[in-house]
Amino acid sequence: MTLKDNFYTICNATHDADSHVFEVKLNANHEIYAAHFPGNAITPGACTLQMVAEMVQETTGKCLQLACAKNVKYLAPITPQNTPCPTFVLNIKNDGQEYAVKAEVKNGEQVFAKLSLVYE
């Protein structure tokens, strides 16, 4: 299930050699938030992983699958009411076979998640 342009939209993206920054807008009216959790919407961790995967694929231009989640830390809840526009910062390294991704989800200095993932 693709979440882009439904659950979230990319408002701005900047890229340099290794760093890729995506400013997104969460859709607070999406049906996922009605279930997770009614009256207190929180972005599910699985959706955060999927958003990172979609951004990695958009950046690389390749259809990739998550091979390994080396480290996934959720440090604070991402709520569409309090943080409607989080920033995803991705550092992508390609060794020819795999894409090692270090990602942070944040809003200013507040860090919501840190992820170390490998895609093939």
Locations of regions flagged by a protein language model:
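HotDog/MaoC-like acyl-thioester-processing domains
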Residues: D16, N91-E120
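Compact, glycine-rich, soluble single-domain proteins
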Residues: G39-P44, T48-L49, A53
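Hydrophobic beta-strand-centered segment that forms part of the acyl-chain substrate-binding groove
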Residues: A53-N91, E98-Y99
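Catalytic strand-loop segment that frames the active site of acyl-thioester-processing enzymes
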Residues: T2-T43
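Intrinsic-disorder/low-complexity, polar/charged segments enriched in Ser/Thr/Lys/Arg/Asp/Glu/Gln
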Residues: A17-V21, C47, C85-T87, A100
